[in-house]
């Protein structure tokens, strides 16, 4: 008899989640040396805090960019997932509770299931040969919920969601706190406020050309090289460019 915690390991949606996270997470590798200086330069922007169990049931609206609609969420984990996706290069849109799927359970009774998110992203960012967009239905669940008393019901819901998604040419994945609450999330959370700043075009171009020439560098080195601008201006512009994927 397999233990509960092992049931999900080989399940396709979990496997897809882990491999997709690993592949998409590589987008941060080149930017890492730039971002490591953030704690020293702008520690006051840190908004991360420890998530307590009582935060599970919070609801609200998340604004991730000035030109995009707010994203509704019904738990802190859903909010964190939306933030995580915001930081991933190639993500085109994040839609909450996009569709309700109807299906028959084992007893022939009609049931409904509404996944938490629909993520659309460019295929080339996933290193896939096909051009165009890739669409993924997503369910957000705590690991304890996956392995709890409702596990059989969840498995049935997810099975039908996966079949429905494949019929549409989409995919379906389950994300837990293990995939969401990572160092990647903390970096994205800290960069989020910079997405709302106006760009300083001369600084932006100078930063872009410097990074393009030197490939891997640090914010401090960029600021030292671009002596026509103040260090504060350069720091802010670099962080904004990281937040909006203009660098790496």
Annotate each PLM feature.
Residues 1-248:
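Electrostatic, structured charged patches in enzyme active sites and in nucleic-acid/phosphate-binding
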